[in-house]
Amino acid sequence: MSASLAFVFPGQGSQSLGMLKELGAEKPVIVETFKEASDALGYDLWKLVQEGPEEQLNQTDKTQPAILTASIALWRLWLEEGGATPAFVSGHSLGEYSALVAAGSLSLKDAVRLVERRGQLMQEAVPAGHGAMAAILGLDDAVVVEICGRAAEDEVVSAVNFNSPGQVVIAGNKAAVDRAMELCKEAGAKRALPLAVSVPSHCALMKPAAERFAENVNAIEWKAPQIPVVQNVTAAIAPDLDALKHDLLAQLYQPVRWVECVQTLAANGAVNLVECGPGKVLAGLNKRCADGVTTYNLNTPDAVAATRAALA
Protein backbone atom coordinates (compact mmCIF):
# COMPACT_ATOMS: atom_id res chain seq x y z
CA MET A 1 0.00 0.00 0.00
CA SER A 2 1.30 3.46 -0.90
CA ALA A 3 0.36 6.18 1.62
CA SER A 4 0.78 8.99 -0.92
CA LEU A 5 -1.37 7.30 -3.58
CA ALA A 6 -5.10 7.75 -4.24
CA PHE A 7 -7.17 6.49 -7.15
CA VAL A 8 -9.88 8.81 -8.47
CA PHE A 9 -12.65 7.59 -10.75
CA PRO A 10 -14.40 9.83 -13.31
CA GLY A 11 -18.10 10.30 -13.96
CA GLN A 12 -20.20 10.89 -17.05
CA GLY A 13 -18.57 12.89 -19.80
CA SER A 14 -15.48 10.65 -19.90
CA GLN A 15 -17.02 8.26 -22.42
CA SER A 16 -15.99 8.18 -26.07
CA LEU A 17 -16.58 5.75 -28.89
CA GLY A 18 -13.61 3.38 -29.15
CA MET A 19 -12.38 4.05 -25.60
CA LEU A 20 -9.73 1.58 -24.35
CA LYS A 21 -9.46 0.07 -27.85
CA GLU A 22 -5.63 -0.10 -27.81
CA LEU A 23 -5.47 -1.50 -24.29
CA GLY A 24 -8.23 -3.99 -25.12
CA ALA A 25 -6.15 -5.34 -28.00
CA GLU A 26 -3.08 -5.78 -25.77
CA LYS A 27 -4.42 -6.71 -22.33
CA PRO A 28 -6.93 -9.59 -21.95
CA VAL A 29 -8.16 -8.29 -18.57
CA ILE A 30 -9.82 -5.32 -20.30
CA VAL A 31 -12.07 -7.38 -22.57
CA GLU A 32 -12.62 -10.00 -19.81
CA THR A 33 -13.93 -7.28 -17.48
CA PHE A 34 -16.30 -6.02 -20.17
CA LYS A 35 -17.47 -9.62 -20.76
CA GLU A 36 -18.31 -9.95 -17.05
CA ALA A 37 -20.31 -6.70 -17.18
CA SER A 38 -22.04 -7.74 -20.42
CA ASP A 39 -23.15 -11.02 -18.85
CA ALA A 40 -24.72 -9.08 -15.95
CA LEU A 41 -26.42 -6.53 -18.24
CA GLY A 42 -27.63 -8.89 -20.97
CA TYR A 43 -26.04 -7.05 -23.91
CA ASP A 44 -22.55 -6.72 -25.41
CA LEU A 45 -21.14 -3.65 -23.67
CA TRP A 46 -17.70 -3.85 -25.33
CA LYS A 47 -19.34 -3.86 -28.78
CA LEU A 48 -21.43 -0.81 -27.86
CA VAL A 49 -18.36 1.03 -26.54
CA GLN A 50 -16.28 0.21 -29.63
CA GLU A 51 -18.86 0.39 -32.41
CA GLY A 52 -21.75 2.46 -31.11
CA PRO A 53 -24.16 3.82 -32.09
CA GLU A 54 -22.82 6.83 -30.22
CA GLU A 55 -26.32 8.17 -29.37
CA GLN A 56 -26.95 4.92 -27.51
CA LEU A 57 -23.63 5.09 -25.64
CA ASN A 58 -24.54 8.63 -24.56
CA GLN A 59 -27.87 7.58 -23.02
CA THR A 60 -27.30 7.78 -19.28
CA ASP A 61 -28.43 4.17 -18.57
CA LYS A 62 -25.74 2.98 -21.04
CA THR A 63 -23.09 5.60 -20.28
CA GLN A 64 -22.98 4.79 -16.58
CA PRO A 65 -22.25 1.03 -16.89
CA ALA A 66 -19.78 1.76 -19.72
CA ILE A 67 -17.65 4.21 -17.71
CA LEU A 68 -17.81 2.09 -14.56
CA THR A 69 -16.71 -1.04 -16.45
CA ALA A 70 -13.90 0.80 -18.24
CA SER A 71 -12.71 2.16 -14.89
CA ILE A 72 -12.74 -1.25 -13.19
CA ALA A 73 -10.98 -2.84 -16.19
CA LEU A 74 -8.15 -0.31 -15.72
CA TRP A 75 -8.14 -0.88 -11.95
CA ARG A 76 -7.77 -4.63 -12.48
CA LEU A 77 -5.01 -4.06 -15.04
CA TRP A 78 -3.13 -1.85 -12.57
CA LEU A 79 -3.28 -4.51 -9.84
CA GLU A 80 -2.54 -7.39 -12.24
CA GLU A 81 0.65 -5.66 -13.33
CA GLY A 82 1.86 -5.18 -9.76
CA GLY A 83 0.72 -1.60 -9.15
CA ALA A 84 0.56 -0.44 -5.53
CA THR A 85 -2.76 -0.41 -3.68
CA PRO A 86 -3.82 3.20 -3.00
CA ALA A 87 -4.35 4.57 0.50
CA PHE A 88 -7.68 6.13 -0.58
CA VAL A 89 -10.19 6.06 -3.41
CA SER A 90 -12.73 8.65 -4.51
CA GLY A 91 -14.99 9.09 -7.51
CA HIS A 92 -16.73 12.01 -9.20
CA SER A 93 -20.50 11.43 -9.24
CA LEU A 94 -21.00 8.08 -11.02
CA GLY A 95 -17.30 7.46 -10.31
CA GLU A 96 -18.15 6.95 -6.63
CA TYR A 97 -19.64 3.58 -7.64
CA SER A 98 -16.42 2.63 -9.45
CA ALA A 99 -14.50 3.61 -6.30
CA LEU A 100 -16.74 1.36 -4.19
CA VAL A 101 -16.11 -1.61 -6.51
CA ALA A 102 -12.35 -0.96 -6.31
CA ALA A 103 -12.63 -0.78 -2.51
CA GLY A 104 -14.37 -4.19 -2.43
CA SER A 105 -17.67 -2.79 -1.16
CA LEU A 106 -19.77 -4.24 -3.99
CA SER A 107 -19.21 -6.58 -6.92
CA LEU A 108 -18.82 -5.45 -10.54
CA LYS A 109 -21.92 -7.47 -11.44
CA ASP A 110 -24.07 -5.70 -8.85
CA ALA A 111 -22.52 -2.31 -9.62
CA VAL A 112 -23.23 -2.30 -13.37
CA ARG A 113 -26.84 -3.28 -12.77
CA LEU A 114 -27.13 -0.67 -10.04
CA VAL A 115 -25.81 2.20 -12.19
CA GLU A 116 -27.93 1.09 -15.15
CA ARG A 117 -30.95 1.40 -12.84
CA ARG A 118 -29.62 4.72 -11.53
CA GLY A 119 -29.54 6.00 -15.12
CA GLN A 120 -33.07 4.78 -15.83
CA LEU A 121 -34.49 6.40 -12.70
CA MET A 122 -32.65 9.67 -13.34
CA GLN A 123 -34.05 9.77 -16.88
CA GLU A 124 -37.58 9.00 -15.65
CA ALA A 125 -37.45 11.67 -12.92
CA VAL A 126 -37.41 14.57 -15.39
CA PRO A 127 -38.95 14.35 -18.88
CA ALA A 128 -36.50 14.95 -21.75
CA GLY A 129 -36.11 18.65 -22.48
CA HIS A 130 -37.44 19.78 -19.08
CA GLY A 131 -34.11 19.77 -17.25
CA ALA A 132 -30.72 21.28 -18.02
CA MET A 133 -27.18 21.69 -16.73
CA ALA A 134 -24.62 24.41 -17.41
CA ALA A 135 -20.99 25.08 -16.52
CA ILE A 136 -20.25 28.50 -15.03
CA LEU A 137 -16.63 29.61 -15.37
CA GLY A 138 -14.95 32.49 -13.58
CA LEU A 139 -17.25 33.22 -10.62
CA ASP A 140 -16.79 32.44 -6.93
CA ASP A 141 -18.83 29.51 -5.63
CA ALA A 142 -20.79 31.74 -3.25
CA VAL A 143 -21.82 34.08 -6.08
CA VAL A 144 -23.12 31.17 -8.17
CA VAL A 145 -25.06 29.79 -5.19
CA GLU A 146 -26.61 33.22 -4.53
CA ILE A 147 -27.55 33.69 -8.20
CA CYS A 148 -29.23 30.26 -8.30
CA GLY A 149 -31.31 31.29 -5.28
CA ARG A 150 -32.53 34.35 -7.18
CA ALA A 151 -33.02 32.59 -10.52
CA ALA A 152 -35.04 29.67 -9.15
CA GLU A 153 -38.29 31.62 -8.61
CA ASP A 154 -40.85 28.78 -8.28
CA GLU A 155 -38.60 26.23 -10.01
CA VAL A 156 -35.34 24.43 -9.22
CA VAL A 157 -31.80 25.54 -10.06
CA SER A 158 -28.80 24.95 -7.83
CA ALA A 159 -25.02 24.61 -7.87
CA VAL A 160 -24.43 20.87 -8.19
CA ASN A 161 -20.75 20.24 -9.01
CA PHE A 162 -17.96 22.22 -7.38
CA ASN A 163 -15.37 20.91 -9.85
CA SER A 164 -12.46 23.28 -9.37
CA PRO A 165 -12.05 26.86 -8.17
CA GLY A 166 -13.95 29.03 -10.63
CA GLN A 167 -15.72 26.10 -12.28
CA VAL A 168 -19.19 25.29 -10.96
CA VAL A 169 -21.92 23.29 -12.70
CA ILE A 170 -25.55 24.24 -12.13
CA ALA A 171 -28.64 22.10 -12.77
CA GLY A 172 -32.42 22.26 -12.57
CA ASN A 173 -35.49 23.12 -14.62
CA LYS A 174 -34.45 24.35 -18.05
CA ALA A 175 -36.02 27.81 -17.77
CA ALA A 176 -34.46 28.37 -14.33
CA VAL A 177 -31.03 27.27 -15.59
CA ASP A 178 -31.40 29.69 -18.51
CA ARG A 179 -32.23 32.52 -16.08
CA ALA A 180 -29.25 31.65 -13.89
CA MET A 181 -26.90 31.57 -16.90
CA GLU A 182 -27.97 35.09 -17.90
CA LEU A 183 -27.52 36.38 -14.34
CA CYS A 184 -24.08 34.73 -14.13
CA LYS A 185 -23.01 36.45 -17.35
CA GLU A 186 -24.26 39.77 -15.97
CA ALA A 187 -22.25 39.13 -12.79
CA GLY A 188 -19.06 38.76 -14.83
CA ALA A 189 -18.77 35.02 -15.53
CA LYS A 190 -16.15 34.31 -18.20
CA ARG A 191 -18.45 31.73 -19.71
CA ALA A 192 -21.82 30.08 -19.07
CA LEU A 193 -21.97 26.93 -21.16
CA PRO A 194 -25.02 24.67 -21.49
CA LEU A 195 -24.00 21.00 -21.15
CA ALA A 196 -25.17 18.34 -23.59
CA VAL A 197 -26.88 16.15 -20.99
CA SER A 198 -30.35 14.67 -20.82
CA VAL A 199 -30.71 14.75 -17.02
CA PRO A 200 -30.21 17.55 -14.42
CA SER A 201 -28.05 15.55 -11.98
CA HIS A 202 -27.44 16.29 -8.29
CA CYS A 203 -30.32 18.75 -7.82
CA ALA A 204 -33.64 18.55 -5.94
CA LEU A 205 -35.44 17.27 -9.07
CA MET A 206 -33.63 13.95 -8.48
CA LYS A 207 -35.08 13.39 -4.99
CA PRO A 208 -37.89 11.11 -6.29
CA ALA A 209 -35.29 9.07 -8.19
CA ALA A 210 -33.26 8.66 -4.99
CA GLU A 211 -36.33 7.49 -3.07
CA ARG A 212 -37.01 4.82 -5.70
CA PHE A 213 -33.31 3.94 -6.01
CA ALA A 214 -33.03 3.17 -2.27
CA GLU A 215 -34.83 -0.12 -2.91
CA ASN A 216 -32.15 -1.18 -5.42
CA VAL A 217 -29.28 -0.06 -3.19
CA ASN A 218 -30.68 -1.99 -0.22
CA ALA A 219 -31.38 -5.13 -2.26
CA ILE A 220 -27.72 -5.96 -2.89
CA GLU A 221 -24.99 -7.28 -0.64
CA TRP A 222 -22.59 -4.59 0.57
CA LYS A 223 -19.30 -5.10 2.37
CA ALA A 224 -17.24 -2.64 4.38
CA PRO A 225 -14.72 -0.97 2.04
CA GLN A 226 -11.20 -2.38 2.23
CA ILE A 227 -9.82 1.00 1.11
CA PRO A 228 -11.19 4.25 2.62
CA VAL A 229 -13.62 6.01 0.24
CA VAL A 230 -13.86 9.82 0.25
CA GLN A 231 -17.46 10.54 -0.71
CA ASN A 232 -18.89 13.40 -2.80
CA VAL A 233 -21.63 14.64 -0.48
CA THR A 234 -19.44 15.01 2.62
CA ALA A 235 -15.89 15.16 1.18
CA ALA A 236 -15.16 12.73 4.00
CA ILE A 237 -14.91 9.02 4.79
CA ALA A 238 -18.16 7.51 6.06
CA PRO A 239 -17.93 6.06 9.59
CA ASP A 240 -19.90 2.92 8.68
CA LEU A 241 -21.73 1.13 5.88
CA ASP A 242 -25.14 2.65 6.70
CA ALA A 243 -23.72 6.18 6.48
CA LEU A 244 -21.93 5.27 3.25
CA LYS A 245 -25.16 4.07 1.61
CA HIS A 246 -27.07 7.09 2.92
CA ASP A 247 -24.50 9.47 1.40
CA LEU A 248 -24.47 7.51 -1.86
CA LEU A 249 -28.25 7.98 -2.21
CA ALA A 250 -28.06 11.65 -1.16
CA GLN A 251 -25.50 12.18 -3.93
CA LEU A 252 -28.31 11.89 -6.50
CA TYR A 253 -29.83 15.18 -5.33
CA GLN A 254 -26.98 16.90 -3.46
CA PRO A 255 -23.83 18.56 -4.84
CA VAL A 256 -20.56 16.86 -5.76
CA ARG A 257 -17.97 18.62 -3.59
CA TRP A 258 -15.02 17.61 -5.77
CA VAL A 259 -12.67 20.45 -4.79
CA GLU A 260 -13.02 19.43 -1.14
CA CYS A 261 -12.64 15.73 -1.99
CA VAL A 262 -9.25 16.42 -3.59
CA GLN A 263 -8.31 18.64 -0.64
CA THR A 264 -9.26 15.84 1.78
CA LEU A 265 -7.01 13.41 -0.11
CA ALA A 266 -4.12 15.90 -0.11
CA ALA A 267 -4.59 16.73 3.58
CA ASN A 268 -4.25 13.01 4.32
CA GLY A 269 -0.98 12.81 2.39
CA ALA A 270 -2.37 11.39 -0.85
CA VAL A 271 -0.86 13.82 -3.37
CA ASN A 272 -0.26 11.31 -6.18
CA LEU A 273 -3.66 10.76 -7.81
CA VAL A 274 -4.30 8.21 -10.54
CA GLU A 275 -7.33 8.93 -12.73
CA CYS A 276 -8.66 5.43 -13.23
CA GLY A 277 -10.97 5.88 -16.19
CA PRO A 278 -11.20 6.27 -19.94
CA GLY A 279 -10.55 10.03 -20.21
CA LYS A 280 -8.51 12.83 -18.63
CA VAL A 281 -11.30 15.01 -17.22
CA LEU A 282 -10.21 14.81 -13.56
CA ALA A 283 -6.53 15.47 -14.34
CA GLY A 284 -7.58 18.89 -15.62
CA LEU A 285 -9.61 19.67 -12.49
CA ASN A 286 -7.42 18.22 -9.75
CA LYS A 287 -4.38 20.44 -10.21
CA ARG A 288 -6.53 23.50 -9.50
CA CYS A 289 -8.12 21.98 -6.40
CA ALA A 290 -5.10 21.54 -4.10
CA ASP A 291 -1.42 22.51 -4.11
CA GLY A 292 1.17 19.81 -4.65
CA VAL A 293 -1.22 17.32 -6.24
CA THR A 294 -0.18 15.43 -9.40
CA THR A 295 -2.65 13.36 -11.43
CA TYR A 296 -1.55 10.44 -13.61
CA ASN A 297 -3.66 8.65 -16.22
CA LEU A 298 -4.28 5.07 -17.38
CA ASN A 299 -6.41 5.63 -20.50
CA THR A 300 -3.87 4.43 -23.14
CA PRO A 301 -0.95 1.94 -23.23
CA ASP A 302 1.51 4.88 -23.15
CA ALA A 303 -0.29 6.45 -20.19
CA VAL A 304 -0.23 3.15 -18.27
CA ALA A 305 3.52 2.76 -18.91
CA ALA A 306 4.26 6.37 -17.92
CA THR A 307 2.21 6.13 -14.72
CA ARG A 308 3.81 2.84 -13.72
CA ALA A 309 7.28 4.33 -14.30
CA ALA A 310 6.47 7.52 -12.37
CA LEU A 311 5.02 5.66 -9.38
CA ALA A 312 7.40 2.68 -9.31
Predicted features, each with a name:
Residues 1-144, 195, 272-302:
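FabD-like malonyl-/acyl-CoA
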Residues 253-270:
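A short, acidic, amphipathic alpha-helical segment used as a generic capping/interface helix at domain edges
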Residues 304-310:
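Short, charged, surface-exposed secondary-structure boundary motifs
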Residues 12-14, 41-43, 103-255, 311:
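Alpha/beta catalytic cores of group-transfer enzymes, especially the acyltransferase/condensing modules
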